[in-house]
Amino acid sequence: MFNAEEKLMIQELLARCAYAYDERDLDMLASCFSADAEMTMCIAGGDVVGPFKGRDQLREMFENAMSGQQDVRRHVISNIFFSELEGASVVYSNLTLLATENGNTKLITAGIYADHVEFSQSECVIKKRHLDLDSGY
């Protein structure tokens, strides 16, 4: 399980990842993931999308998603907690996705992230991420 310092680093990582997406900073966003990271997602209980493997493929997936989004996105990460699953430490957090367009802000979707993170030297990155969304985005 994670110690207090590691938990703080993980919370910073999740905030940085959300901020990078919202600011469309693909370099910062990609740096939140390990070189061999993997991500999957499931929308409204449908089929699993992915896996997207490796930092480059993740960056491309994020860039493609951003290209179709003309609104201003805000990823709000909350209810972060730490658990053990099959011998691995997992970080769970809630996503609330808001969007503003033409001065109107609305809820787009909500979901839950399940992240496996790794530490190297003084850095913390996402190694594996799964996102369960309540509805499309």
Predicted segments — roles?
Residues 1-23, 27-35:
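Short, low-complexity N-terminal intrinsically disordered segments enriched in polar/charged residues
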Residues 4, 49-52, 104:
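Charge-dense, low-complexity intrinsically disordered segments
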Residues 28-94:
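A solvent-exposed, acidic/Ser-Thr-rich amphipathic alpha-helical stretch
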Residues 67-137:
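A beta-strand edge to alpha-helix "cap/lid" segment located at domain peripheries
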